[in-house]
Swiss-Prot record:
Official protein name in the record: Methane monooxygenase component A alpha chain
Top-rank taxon: Bacteria
Active site, UniProt feature: 151
GO MF annotations, alphabetized: metal ion binding; methane monooxygenase [NAD(P)H] activity
Annotated binding of Fe cation 2, by residue: 209, 243, 246
Species annotation: Methylosinus trichosporium
Gene (name only): mmoX
Length: 526
């Protein structure tokens, strides 16, 4: 049958002008911008002192369909590996006990950071006016929801497959009494969501993600693998695949305010404050968790810190922002000095107050001590002597009634909490750079440990009103505080925290009560 002239004409035209068989995502992204609309006013909760330009672009140009396809593929690989392959191999019980305890802290604390990053990214969406910039922030909101679930899933997985689930399965209610909890909230919550949206972007994207993502999320996979943990790398490396887009969002935030006069006036100060506050917590806490919470070491924390924070971020990353007037933080040099001893100083406080935690802490053994001395000359004569004395006095034995915190007080070594960072500090035993200084404001005394934090506090003392663990529990007996904070296992009497990783000789509330440890307020003497 002969075809019609119209059909023939159409066929000939298609031969010359082939119909498209697909559309590139970048073309769709460009087309979607035509559907943008102007907002009469931004609805952000807090005003910003910066003006974000209306023509700012998004580097990755993500569209919802491609984003969903990409993340679905990653989740299939991640959960498929965890729920099938690693479960069949019994991966949960191949983790060294010391590292399994460390992950009780890392995954739980990081979950809080990811959760608050949801709100931080949404605040930036509210503040931005450029359609592409809003699109980048929206994708990050979805990422942070995913990351929150992933961190929670690590604790869930450990709860089911690790031999000591206590701490993994109930840290959300127990963590509040811990001496490291309020400091974590300071960097992972207050800094991300409180106040100026652009300042929050500096805290989250420019410092938290661009600076500390690598020494946290990337480095932790190396330490985990070295200690038999295949669970954490499976999840955290999937998390890290999203972080580059978040760093790009921070870069675009800076680009969007580059021509704003407020940028020249405030940006470098905000960056320095954000960096110092975060490093004041992350530098000692991550070093302590990696080196003291592992059996098999990867490298000295000071080397990891120097590579990722000082060279990669402070030099290369911030250097790329130099054309927009951004400078490396003035406090970076002091932070570099902190990276050598600060985590060892914190370790003393963490071990001394172990009953308030939700993980089991084993003192460094002979092999650990040799490693510390080889990499931190002078460690043995200071920290090693204290740990060895504690062990002789019965640190691990519940019958001894020995609480290291009481030993510190009896020997004149008061533990203070830095008001700005909320990090514990023992000035009389510290080898780091800090020193104690005390101020009074609104009828309340405040301890501070360094020049940069003191400067921040003096400018805005009302911003740092959070009471610390000693003010909260002054005059209270330790076992009462533990019971009130649900720091016990399912039997209602055995502590979740323990001073060793064995299954015997477990401390109970009665053991703690016999010691008669009562919290004093160290600032009462001033």
């Amino acid at each position: 049958m002969a075809i019609s002239l119209a059909t023939k004409a159409a066929t000939d035209a298609l031969k010359v002008n082939r119909a498209p068989v697909g559309v590139e995502p970048q073309e769709v992204h460009k087309w979607l911008q035509s559907f943008n609309w102007d907002f009469k006013e931004n609805r952000t909760k807090y005003p910003t002192k910066y003006h974000m330009a209306n023509e700012t672009k998004e580097q990755f140009k993500v569209i919802a369909k491609e984003y969903a396809r990409m993340e679905a593929a990653k989740d299939e690989r991640q959960f498929g590996t965890l729920l099938d392959g690693l479960t069949r191999l019994g991966a949960g019980n191949k983790v060294h006990p010391r590292w399994g305890e460390t992950m009780k802290v890392i995954s739980n604390f990081l979950e809080v950071g990811e959760y608050n990053a949801i709100a931080a990214s949404a605040m930036l969406w509210d503040s931005a006016t450029a359609a592409e910039q809003k699109n980048g922030y929206l994708a990050q909101v979805l990422d942070e929801i995913r990351h929150t679930h992933q961190c929670a899933f690590i604790n869930h997985y450990y709860s089911k497959h690790y031999h000591d689930p206590a701490g993994h399965n109930d840290a959300r209610r127990t963590r509040a009494i811990g001496p490291l909890w309020k400091g974590m909230k300071r960097v992972f919550a207050d800094g991300f969501i409180s106040g100026d949206a652009v300042e929050c972007s500096v805290n989250l994207q420019l410092v938290g993600e661009a600076c500390f993502t690598n020494p946290l999320i990337v480095a932790v996979t190396e330490w985990a693998s070295a200690n038999g943990d295949e669970i954490t790398p499976t999840v955290f490396l999937s998390v890290e695949t999203d972080e580059l887009r978040h760093m790009a969002n921070g870069y675009q935030t800076v680009v969007s305010i580059a021509n704003d006069p407020a940028s020249a006036k405030f940006l470098n100060t905000d960056l320095n404050n954000a960096f110092w506050t975060q490093q004041k917590y992350f530098t000692p806490v991550l070093g302590y968790l990696f080196e003291y919470g592992s059996k098999f070491k990867v490298e000295p924390w000071v080397k990891t810190w120097n590579r990722w924070v000082y060279e990669d971020w402070g030099g290369i990353w911030i250097g790329r922002l130099g054309k927009y007037g951004v400078e490396s933080p003035a406090s970076l040099r002091d932070a570099k000095r902190d990276a050598y001893w600060a985590h060892h100083d914190l370790a003393l406080a963490a071990y001394a107050m172990w009953p308030l935690g939700f993980a089991r802490l084993a003192l460094p053994d002979e092999e650990d001590q040799a490693w510390f001395e080889a990499n931190y000359p002078g460690w043995a004569d200071h920290y090693g002597k204290i740990f060895n004395e504690w062990k002789k006095l019965g640190y691990e034995d519940p019958k001894s009634g020995f609480i290291p915190y009481q030993w510190l007080l009896a020997n004149g070594h008061d533990v203070y909490i830095d008001r700005v960072s909320q990090v514990p500090f023992i000035p009389s035993l510290a080898k780091g750079t800090g020193s104690l200084r005390v101020h009074e404001f609104n009828g309340k005394k405040h301890s501070l440990t360094d020049d940069w934090g003191e400067r921040q506090w003096l400018i805005e003392p009302e911003r740092y009103e959070c009471h610390n663990v000693f003010e909260q529990y002054e005059g209270r007996e330790l076992s009462e505080v533990i019971a009130e904070g649900h720091g016990v296992r399912s039997d209602g009497k055995t502590l979740i925290a323990q001073p060793h990783t064995r299954g015997d000789n477990l401390w109970t509330l009665e053991d703690i009560k016999r010691a008669g440890c009562v919290f004093p307020d160290p600032l009462a003497k001033f």
